[in-house]
Amino acid sequence: SGAAAAQTAAASSLHQASNHTFYPWMAIAGESTADPIKSKIRSDLTQYGGISTDMGKRYSESLAGSLLPDWLGTNGLRRRGRQTYTR
């Protein structure tokens, strides 16, 4: 249901992230689609935005299964270790 999905998205942005919560920006990064239109959009994103050189492509492919799209930077959606943001 749409309300439950919106509630899950709101809760996932407030609380700590787990592997099973849905983030709204995960729809951008999805590789599991067989839709040629979406894959064309994704290939345009990887070609024109972010890392587009062969060196960058090899670097992003050498990150073994990082689940991050290669147009995200190194500090894109990562968690830092035990860092306190507010005191």
UniProtKB/Swiss-Prot annotation:
Q: In which tissues is it expressed?
A: In the embryo, expression is seen in the epidermis, somatic and visceral mesoderm, and the peripheral and central nervous system.
What's the source species for this entry? Drosophila hydei (Fruit fly)
What Gene Ontology cellular component terms go with this record?
A: nucleus
In the record, the note on similarity to other proteins reads: Belongs to the Antp homeobox family.
Please classify the protein's predominant subcellular localization into one broad category: nucleus
Q: Which residues cross the membrane?
A: none
Q: Where does the source fall among the domains of life?
A: Eukaryota
Q: Name one GO molecular function term.
A: DNA-binding transcription factor activity
Compartment(s):
Nucleus
Q: Which UniProt keywords apply?
A: Activator, Developmental protein, DNA-binding, Homeobox, Nucleus, Transcription, Transcription regulation
Name under which the protein is recorded: Homeotic protein ultrabithorax
Relate the protein's function as given in its record.
Sequence-specific transcription factor which is part of a developmental regulatory system that provides cells with specific positional identities on the anterior-posterior axis. Binds the consensus region 5'-TTAAT[GT][GA]-3'. This homeotic protein controls development of the cells in the posterior thoracic and first abdominal segments. It activates the synthesis of the decapentaplegic (DPP) growth factor.
Coordinates of motif Antp-type hexapeptide in the sequence? Answer: 22-27
